[in-house]
Curated annotation (Swiss-Prot):
Entry coiled-coil feature ranges: none
E.C. number(s) listed in UniProt: 2.7.7.6
Comment field (misc): In S.helveticum the gene for this protein is split in two.
Name of the gene: rpoB2
UniProt keyword list: Chloroplast, DNA-directed RNA polymerase, Nucleotidyltransferase, Plastid, Transcription, Transferase
Protein name: DNA-directed RNA polymerase subunit beta C-terminal section
Taxonomic path: Eukaryota, Viridiplantae, Chlorophyta, core chlorophytes, Chlorophyceae
GO MF term (any one): DNA binding
Cellular location(s): Plastid, Chloroplast
Pfam families, per database record: RNA_pol_Rpb2_6 (PF00562), RNA_pol_Rpb2_7 (PF04560)
Length: 1080
């Protein structure tokens, strides 16, 4: 049996590329297409790349498409796709991104890449890091995980006594200086896998005088040796310094054996004789005697150094030894012959000695070849250290065994975390196709994905197959390319016939109808072979009857459907996004909802142009999980927004003092950076006064009827009770009870704290108006009424999930202010305030007459409400907006925090929230120059963003508890007129390009009017020779001589299976069609 050796087969290895990063962050890889044992020869395919299959260029998918409009979602160039493309990963791509981090030096020290981060020592954030603090290969990381651990010193190191340092070293303790965690983390919205890590060591200066160096060369040799010495004159007489990690103490007898190594060119370097000329070379006998005498007299040890050839021009071995005497003559000589123990040194002629000298040459301009470290002399000892740690220092011809040196290696020779100066880490992530991605065909038909529908909602074929993509039919005449229609229909035929086609360009050379005839013939063959009659209909070729996936009804018109080759382009959605980050919240009728949880069914708070607050359903919501770009961050005490640069902000000029909403306008964030602008936090709530009716209850089989409440009194009572009241079922003893009005005893008790005088005064006035009697009990007012108790019990104090009732949102703006001010009264401190004056005034006058005056006098700056209920805190912020003011939410005390009160420690069982009510200053300004409390910056960002579109284009949003009005997330620029083409190409604000005017004309006027315009006015403008329009005006017979562009348009419309033709009436007024092919 013949083997590879008998056949003289030489194995050839090919290195395949696996998941390499491209310049556009895509992945490049090779996939083998052959197996071991297969026979291949020159020209055979061995592997495919990421963009090929079977050796052919392949970057897309053959999918089922249809040219039809669908609810406006594929308007203009928009594309509607099925969720099958997402779930089946037909357009899922792998992207590789590089993240790097480096260490820098600050005034307090040098940053360090390490795993030892004290602040995270007791957490699980460091589990996936290796000993150097770098994420391990293959680790799956998500948003916020550490890629590379790094610490930055924030204060200078303190000097520690030596005995303290010794004590800490013995016990293994480390002194923790002030450091900051500056680790590199995974950006927002990213979940990826670590596939490659590159570390770079620190680059230390290898010589003190890096600029002044000289080179050592040998002219007689075919190679050259380059190392560096100081150029200063004072250093010329110093010993040549070379360093090596590998050094061995050896005697002179060991050194003498070097002469007998085979093929080892030798250099002997002595001291103090580099520039001296060798005049009298010793004779054979004297030389022998001198050398052996030196050998016998010496008992000291010498150093032997050896460096394997690193570069192609380096010699194999370099030897150096230092003579035992301080003033030994130095000689350079080279001998290429092989010596043995018997052979003595030969006397060299002057020419030979001159040629074999290694001379030192000083060059002003030289190129750096290699660096061999700096001089290190200690007590007359010289060592040699190369700057290439991976270089082997032992050659095969050396008598030193490599294993002897390998035993001396330890962990210190390898890369330590303290030596790492920078790290490049590569993450691989999968990106599925999403809304906003750009797709294109092979004929210039590109577009943006606008919606992803469930496959059951997509239109489907007569056999039940749902389509994968819906394209706008108006994109065909605008592209001026009929090839996409032919490809679509031919793909449908090839799918059912199992065939592939290669169409030669310019196939019209075979006939004027070559493409059309070939496509129709293949469709007919598919119909005959499969028995599916719907594949080809002679009366309407190329069109199919499709059914609506939502209703099952058939569409009125037949639709062009087939298979086409569609490509997903590089992700370009980032530049067209008008979005906010996920940490924003939106105000709805359901309360404050995170931006990523808002649905089109929610009613979002929006602002009209006149400043009126209304609630509307969002028209659309967009989510882009892989946004990568810059964000605009603006923050001060009343404002906090983090948006994309294209997001429109609702602002006005800072110099305008008026509070009218007319002056506000929507401006992109990138256009207001650094400018003095004012934002808006308030709105006008246009509601009629609301009348509250207390629901009826059943008590002891008796129905207590509904009760209509006095609204002014009820709002103040309810506002105080929601802050300081609770419902009890205990029976209160008669002790410590003072009867204010006699009332029947009842176990259903409503109790309100009256520790503050102003609260007591208000309750004394409003409770009798409401028709209740009350008692005093331990600094509390108690009301015994089952009907009131039953309604107020779910809203009792101490319930962490309580919220305002629904009827509150039907209050008018004045009523909302009364309720809000009553709630804040409980937390208002001070005496003789405007509130107390208003309360005392209301005790003397009727509440209805004092009510407007009460609102005017209660304007105060420091108004706050405190609660442990998150829902209630959000409701109060919304109530402030209904009142024409605004509210900022702050987390005052976190759950579990400890506070001291009267010498006792109190542990918070819930989060304590403070809502700051702002009544007057609701136009926060930025970049006004008065103080530097605000912050404005443009930050790099990668992660998820959300886009919200509302009809009024302005909605209410908050971040970190600070609410403000902001602009619509997505906008379309002004539309250009149909008959107007912008100069200098495409307009930046939505203008059409040449060829798109016909599309708009067809859509607006209809095909007949458009053809009339093109046939008359346009044709005259283009050619300047036709007189059709004059003939129409003067009612003369028309002469058909249309331009070539009109013929192209007619052909494309016919390719869409539209019945296009020119008809002429004969003498009998019978229309007869004119052959288009004979025109022009």
């Amino acid at each position: 049996m013949s083997t590879s050796q008998s056949l003289n087969i030489i194995p050839i290895e090919y290195s395949l590329q696996t998941y390499q990063r491209s310049n556009q962050d895509t992945s490049m890889l090779h996939r083998p297409v052959v197996k071991e044992g297969e026979w291949v020869q020159a020209g055979d395919l061995l592997s495919d790349c990421a963009s090929s299959i079977g050796g052919e260029f392949s970057i897309g998918q053959n999918i089922l498409i249809a040219y039809l409009p669908w609810e406006g979602y594929n308007y203009e160039d928009a594309i509607l796709i099925s969720e099958r493309l997402v779930y089946d990963d037909l357009y899922t791509s792998i992207h590789i991104e590089r993240y790097d981090i480096s260490t820098e030096k600050n005034p307090y020290g040098i940053e360090k890449i390490t795993k030892d981060i004290v602040l995270l020592k007791d957490t699980t954030e460091l589990n996936h890091l290796d000993k150097n603090g770098i994420a391990q290969l293959g680790a799956w990381l998500k948003e916020g995980d550490i890629l590379v651990g790094k610490i930055t010193p924030t204060e200078s190191k303190k000097e520690v006594a030596r005995y303290v340092q010794l004590y800490n070293d013995i016990l293994g303790k480390k002194i923790n200086y002030a450091i900051r965690d500056s680790s590199l983390r995974v950006p927002r919205g990213l979940e990826a896998k670590v596939i490659r890590v590159k570390t770079f060591p620190e680059r230390k200066n290898e010589t003190k005088n890096w600029e002044n160096k000289i080179g050592l060369k040998s002219k007689a040799l075919a190679f050259s040796v380059q190392h560096f010495l100081s150029k200063n004159q004072s250093n010329k007489k110093r010993t040549l310094s070379l360093k090596s990690k590998w050094e061995k103490e050896t005697s002179l007898s060991s050194f003498s054996s070097l002469a007998w190594q085979k093929k080892s060119p030798l250099f002997f370097v002595f001291k103090n004789g580099i520039f001296e000329k060798l005049k009298n070379f010793p004779k054979k006998k004297k030389k022998n005697e001198r050398v052996f005498a030196l050998k016998k007299k010496s008992s000291k040890k010498f150093r032997f150094f050896e460096l394997q050839k690193k570069f192609r021009f380096f010699f194999r071995n370099f030897f150096f030894f230092k003579a035992p005497k301080k003033k030994s003559p130095l000689f350079f000589f080279f001998k290429s012959e092989t010596f043995d123990k018997e052979r003595n040194f030969q006397k060299m002629s002057p020419n030979q000695s001159k040629q074999n000298w290694v001379k030192i040459s000083i060059k002003k301009e030289w190129q750096k070849v290699g660096s061999f470290g700096k001089k290190k002399a200690s007590k007359g000892k010289i060592s040699f250290f190369p700057s290439f740690p991976q270089a082997s220092l032992v050659g095969k011809a050396s008598f030193f065994s490599p294993s002897r040196f390998e035993k001396k290696r330890d962990a210190s020779n390898f890369l330590k975390s303290s030596c790492i100066s920078s790290v490049h880490i590569y993450l691989a992530e999968k990106r599925k196709v999403q809304v906003g991605d750009k797709m294109a065909g092979r004929h210039g038909n590109k577009g943006i994905i606008s919606q992803i529908l469930p496959r059951q909602d997509m239109p489907y074929l007569p056999d039940g197959t749902p389509i994968d993509m819906a394209l706008n039919p108006l994109g065909v005449p605008s592209r001026m390319n009929v090839g996409q229609i032919y490809e679509c229909l031919l793909g449908l035929a090839g799918k059912h016939l199992g065939e592939q086609y290669r169409i030669q360009p310019f196939d019209e050379a075979f006939g004027p109808e070559a493409s059309r005839s070939f496509v129709f013939s293949k469709l007919y063959s598919a119909k005959t072979k499969t028995g599916q009659s719907w594949l080809f209909q002679p009366t309407n070729p190329g069109k199919l009857k499709l059914f609506d996936g939502r209703t099952g009804n058939c569409f009125d018109q037949a639709i062009t459907t087939g298979y086409s080759y569609m490509i997903k382009l590089v992700h370009l959605v980032d530049e067209k996004i008008h979005c906010l980050t996920v940490d924003h919240e939106v105000l709805t009728t359901k309360g404050w909802i995170p931006l990523n949880k808002v649905k089109t069914s929610h009613f979002v708070a929006t602002l009209k142009k006149n400043g009126q607050l209304v609630y509307q359903n969002p028209t659309n919501i967009y989510h882009y999980p892989e946004f990568k770009g810059e964000l605009y961050h603006i923050k001060n005490v009343n404002l906090d927004l983090l948006v994309t640069l294209n997001h429109r902000m609702y602002v006005k000029n800072g110099i305008i003092e008026a509070t009218s909403s007319v002056d506000y306008q929507l401006i992109p964030a990138k256009d207001i950076v650094g400018q003095h602008k004012k934002y808006c936090k308030t709105a006008f709530w246009d509601k009629e006064n609301y009348q509250f009716i207390l629901p009826s209850v059943i008590s002891n089989s008796i129905v207590i009827p509904e009760k209509t409440m006095n609204m002014e009194a009820w709002l103040q009572f309810f506002g105080i009770w929601i802050a300081e009241g609770w419902a009890l079922t205990n029976t209160i003893s008669n002790n410590n009870v003072t009867n204010f009005n006699q009332s029947s005893s009842s176990p259903y008790v409503v109790q309100i704290s009256i520790k503050k005088k102003k609260v007591l005064e208000i309750l004394n006035n409003v409770i009798p108006i409401l028709g209740y009697s009350f008692n005093y009990y331990d600094n509390n007012i108690t009301i015994c009424d089952k009907q009131l108790w039953a309604y107020l019990r779910p809203l009792s104090l101490g319930n962490p999930y309580r919220k305002l009732p629904i009827w509150v949102w039907d209050l008018s703006q004045d009523q909302a202010r009364v309720l809000l001010l009553a709630m804040i009264t409980v937390f208002k401190n001070g005496t003789n305030s405007k509130w107390e004056k208003a309360a005392s005034l209301s005790s003397r006058l009727s509440l209805a007459s004092v009510f407007p005056e009460f609102l005017k006098k209660r304007i105060d700056k420091g108004l706050s409400y405190y609660t442990s209920s998150v829902e209630l805190a959000d409701d109060i912020s919304r109530l402030a907006l209904h009142a024409g003011w605004s509210g900022n939410n702050y987390l005052l005390k976190k759950k579990g925090s400890i506070s001291s009160f009267d010498g006792k420690q109190i542990i918070c069982q819930f989060d304590i929230w403070r809502i700051s009510i702002i009544q007057s200053k609701n136009q926060p300004a930025v970049n006004h120059g008065y103080h530097s409390k605000g912050k404005e910056e443009v930050l790099p960002y990668q992660g998820a963003v959300y886009c919200l579109s509302v009809p009024n284009e302005i909605f209410y949003v908050r971040r970190n508890g600070l609410s403000v009005w902001t602009g619509n997330s997505r906008s379309s620029g002004p539309y250009s007129l149909i008959t107007q083409q912008p100069l200098k190409g495409r307009s930046k604000h939505g203008g059409q390009r040449l060829g798109e005017m016909e599309v708009w004309a067809i859509e607006a006027y209809g095909a007949a009017f458009t053809l009339l315009e093109l046939l008359t006015i346009k044709s005259d403008d283009v050619t300047g020779r036709l007189t059709i329009w004059d003939y129409v005006l003067y009612k003369k017979p028309l002469y058909i001589g249309t331009p070539a562009s009109f013929k192209v348009l007619i052909c494309e419309l016919q390719a869409l299976c539209l019945d296009i033709g020119i008809y002429k009436a004969d003498k009998s007024n019978i229309l007869k069609q004119i052959n288009v092919s004979s025109m022009g």
